[in-house]
Amino acid sequence: QSDIKGRKDSLAHIGVTSCSLAQEWKKNPTRHIVKRIPILVSRRSDYSPMYAGNDPDILYLTSTRNEAKGADLNGITGMKSADIFHSKRNEKKQWQKPEPLASEVNSEFEEGACSFSADGKTMYFTRCRTLPNAPAYAEIYVSQRAGAEWGSPQKCAILNDTLSSVAHPALSPAGDYLYFVSDMPGGQGGLDLWRINVTRDGFGYVDNLGPEINTSGDEMFP
């Protein structure tokens, strides 16, 4: 009982601090200018934009727009299952209408939140499979690009625990660590940020990012 109260008090304190910081940031804005790019957005959910490695002229994003592959509607959002789309800039540096990936990356399930190696040839992404008579878990997959096409995605063997979700991959610039979200045991709260060492042979050890990053609540989208 006292542990639950302590967690709630901690989250309440973070909430109050966030409100104070928001007011401070409004009074002292940065020089960044945020603009809406109409051609990239739809009337559905569009999120998790990511450049294809070091190429600033190819943008990937997650979307539930009508062109997404799955036929079933999400029971929570009422929208189609998300897929990964990409857009390119033309010779005038204008973004083109996003198109779904023409590969096995997208399926009838949820795909999204992708991350790339610096050379743009390796892509990690989240897939949430919903199977009859089985619980739904988020999993991280990897696909390799050969030429213009992405290869058949393979599930990343990050955990031996089959009851925990892993999602929202973010590859470090050097490609030696993969950051992700998980509800696996041993964290600070519900969902925590973790990282795993990426080696030539696959994956190494898993680390929790600790109390400096994680709280008793949920952390997502590293």
Residue ranges with predicted function:
Residues 3-222:
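Short, conserved micro-motifs composed of acidic
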